[in-house]
């Protein structure tokens, strides 16, 4: 698949960097990122998820019979941290849990995944999410924030984690935790020369001053339109592209995930469309989170954005073929196998 400059990023492992696997490089937009000591710090939510499988999502006032239920770790932040670690990044997760059994289980999950856990303990209970998953892979989610809403606990843990951050490190956050905690972490990251990545989900208004703290913005189609102030009664391709250009003028680098249509990347005044991998979705719950975690893992490894986005798309394609949230994130060898098995171009 050609990049905006015409060079290919598919076909061999060479696009993943030098033989050491962790080179550094000067990205024309993001500056110097990647290297042997580069780490990923993910700030965000951690939930105990209860997922229910069903033929379709019920309408208001409707009762339907489920076909199964399961519980496991989730939350956008935790999902992204696990995805980054499984993709090969040295990863730290910053968040908050309650002083309860669910919080201890989430701490154990992070340890098992090799993720350093900066978990503040809140007086509030651990966050909980209830996920409805239809047979076609679509989902509807209700979240009880709990400890994820404890901005003071999260900010304290972030300050500790960021104390050793430096140039080349990446800090990834979402908006399932208090905005003040995210902005505080990004200010500290920028002061230390780290690269900031914001997955603006769930969507909320952000000022120009707030977006100035963001180096890379990741949104889906609806979030793109909403954040740009465009009408959201539909996701026509032209409207999304126009909204993405408006955001790129405020941020610089914007990645819009388009579901089965791939991703749109706007950077350095150029737009690049990256196709998706055609797969049959089983559960799309953690697709976006897996994309974000995999993307920052490759930026940390030294890949340019033009290579990191296809890698993230491959990771998301594997993710949606499995059930669950954090548990559905693929590992590096699986992603590489998919990339090497698909000799296609755009």
Residue ranges and their predicted role:
Residues 114, 149-156, 196-203, 275-276:
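Short gly/ser/thr-rich secondary-structure transition/capping motifs
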Residues 161-165, 210, 247:
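Structural alpha-helical scaffold elements that stabilize or flank donor/cofactor-binding regions
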């Amino acid at each position: 698949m050609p990049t905006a400059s015409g060079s290919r990023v598919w076909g061999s492992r060479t696009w993943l960097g030098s033989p050491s696997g962790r080179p550094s490089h000067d990205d024309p937009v993001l500056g110097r990122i990647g290297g042997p000591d580069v780490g990923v710090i993910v700030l965000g939510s951690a939930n105990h998820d209860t997922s229910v499988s069903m033929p379709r999502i019920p309408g208001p006032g409707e009762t339907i019979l489920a076909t199964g239920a399961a519980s496991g770790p989730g939350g956008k932040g935790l999902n992204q941290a696990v995805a980054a670690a499984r993709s090969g990044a040295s990863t730290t997760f910053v968040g908050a849990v309650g002083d309860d059994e669910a919080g201890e289980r989430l701490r154990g999950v992070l340890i098992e995944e090799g993720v350093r856990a900066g978990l503040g303990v809140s007086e509030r209970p651990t966050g909980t999410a209830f996920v409805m998953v239809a047979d076609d892979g679509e989902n509807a989610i209700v979240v009880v924030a709990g400890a994820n809403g404890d901005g003071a606990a999260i900010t304290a843990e972030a300050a500790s984690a960021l104390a050793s951050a430096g140039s080349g490190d990446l800090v990834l956050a979402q908006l399932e935790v208090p905005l003040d905690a995210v902005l505080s972490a990004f200010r500290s990251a920028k002061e230390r020369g780290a690269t900031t990545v914001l997955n603006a989900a769930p969507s909320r208004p952000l000022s120009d001053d707030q977006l100035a703290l963001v180096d890379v913005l990741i949104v889906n189609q609806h979030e793109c339109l909403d954040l740009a102030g465009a009408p959201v009664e539909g996701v026509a391709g032209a409207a999304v592209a126009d909204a993405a250009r408006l955001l790129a003028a405020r941020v610089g680098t914007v990645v819009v995930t388009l579901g089965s249509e791939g991703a749109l990347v706007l950077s350095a005044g150029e737009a690049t469309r990256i196709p998706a991998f055609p797969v049959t979705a089983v559960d799309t719950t953690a697709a976006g989170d897996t994309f974000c975690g995999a993307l920052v893992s490759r930026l940390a490894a030294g890949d340019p954005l033009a290579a990191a986005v296809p890698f993230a798309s491959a990771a998301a394609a594997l993710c949606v073929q499995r059930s669950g949230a954090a548990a559905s994130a693929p590992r590096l060898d699986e992603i590489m196998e998919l990339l090497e098995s698909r000799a296609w171009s755009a």
